[in-house]
Amino acid sequence: MTGWLPSFARLVTVTLLVVLSIFVALRVAAPYLISTGLVRSGIEDALSKWAGYRAEIAGKPVIEFWPTPRIILSKISVRQKDDGAKLLGTVESLSAEFSLIDAIRGRASFHEFHLLRPNLLLTRESSGVIDWTNEGLLAKAIANAREEGGREVLDKKLDAAIGAITVEDGTVNVADVASGRTFRFDGVTADVSWRKLSSPITAVLIARTSGQDLKLDFSSRSPLLIFGGKSAEMTASLTSGLLTARFQGVANISHLFDLSGNMALSIPDMPALLTWVDRSLPGIATLRTFSLETDVASVPNGFRFDNVNMSMNGSNARGAMDVAFPPGKRAKLGGTLAFDQMNFRSLFDAFILRLAAGEADGPPDGGLLQKLDLDLRLSAKQALVEPFTLSDVGASIIVSSNEAKFDIGDSQFEGGELSAHLEAMRGDFDGGGRLQLSIRGADFAGLIERLQLQGPLPLATGSLDMSVKTSMPLWKAGASDVTGRIAFRARSGSLPGFDAEAVREEAARADFFPLNSVSHRAFAFDNFDITADLADGAATIHGARIEGPQQTLILSGVIPYRSSGLALSGTIEATDPTVSPSLPPLPFFVGGAWPEPVISPAPVTQQGSTK
């Protein structure tokens, strides 16, 4: 049985030696058997055939045969075939492997291309498709590729072999017809694996544009359909220092309303990204980080986002959203988002509620985001409205062409409940707005203590109502620019820093005195009721009543809060009129500045009239 093994070994050895001899002989004899002009003209024709343009080679070709047959060309230019002969690109050096057997037979076929310092000029048509011309082999393959049974199909006569393409230190200029802008990419390095036109493609591209390095990873089983502006499966990811983005699914590069898949976006520094793209949004500095991961699908004139996972400044949200672009109407973003924690300041900035048309550092029409309507329903376990914290919040944002409304329908605040309505007028929000706020049963004592507010302020569980408006843009309005009314009511509390008995005693012997010099006890009250009108930077108080068990404090006058000044008149009188003889009314004036008011008893001649 083993007798035939030596013979078999000899046969194998002889066969290998013959093959090796032929291989070496071909490599040695190739320079004498192959015409350099044939290979040069062959690749020149191949380039012209592929691109559909006229390829010209000015440099002297170099042919290598070891370890594989390869031709190296230099000073290549590609021009249009018409009379204008417009230059479309240049290549400093191009090398390609070729078939030795085909070259000996007088035919040249090439693969494994390497381009050194190519400089390409591309045009992106208004349809979104790159202009591949309609004459080259690539353009014909793109035009004739079709989808059958979920697969890309191409006629065999158009299905040419490619292999691998590598690009080193290239430059690409893309003229975008729709915007009229030209985008330049420098330092382009690419590695493309594409066995033949009908095969799947994988590509990695690294480039630099506007001072930023970008990396694009792309793969598709149907690249011709993708390049031709048809819908097909693809995977793409973009990475840079300013953002990372990823998409996997079915897409159409010329028609965005044909999309289905999963996408992710992460922006670690929003202001830096806006600076890079030369955009400015007032107040956006508070929105530092943003990320989004979602399933996306096209719907008529828009997109639907399901399984949304969104994060802004570390606040995470889940939900569903949709965006619509109805013909002839404003775009609209709607949806429902549930946050674990939410910062309303970041939320306002994120949705551009403070964007002003005509700002010195903004576009004159307010920008594209100004043309977006919103209809969002929001909820949060905890929400920050600096310096306050809300819990179990239900809110909504509605923005139309004429107004913007923000509502907190329900929330827990300091042991009580809070609701609010903010409304901004006009589409660019520079027509002013109004705010309505209602707080019920909140622990103002704990709030005042936590905020470390100074002065005689009511420590009690109470309710507050506020209704103010302004004609100034909301992002510019200050406290002195609003008008309206504020009211506070409370039961059973205390007013620290106001000792009624000590004030009476000091008023009998001094013409004026600092309140904090005589008030070392709190004034206990059973009812606190104060209302103030706000206008021109001042609060006007009309008959505020603070009723204690024995005495009542009545205040009226003006508080210019812009300067922290005080201009009030007041009276301390008996709560029960029947005991007035023992507690006669004491009228006084309040001046100085908050939080250190100065008391000045009214003259005796005025006490009668005041009484």
Set out the residue ranges of the language-model regions.
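Short, surface-exposed ligand-recognition loops at beta-strand->loop->(often short) alpha-helix junctions
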Residues: 34, 384-386
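N-terminal leader/targeting segments and the immediate start of mature chains
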Residues: 50, 358-373
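Surface-exposed acidic, glycine/proline-enriched linker/cap segments
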Residues: 139-154, 358-365, 512-519
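Short extracytoplasmic
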Residues: 48-75
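Small-residue helix/turn framework positions
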Residues: 68-90, 95, 109-141, 163-173, ...
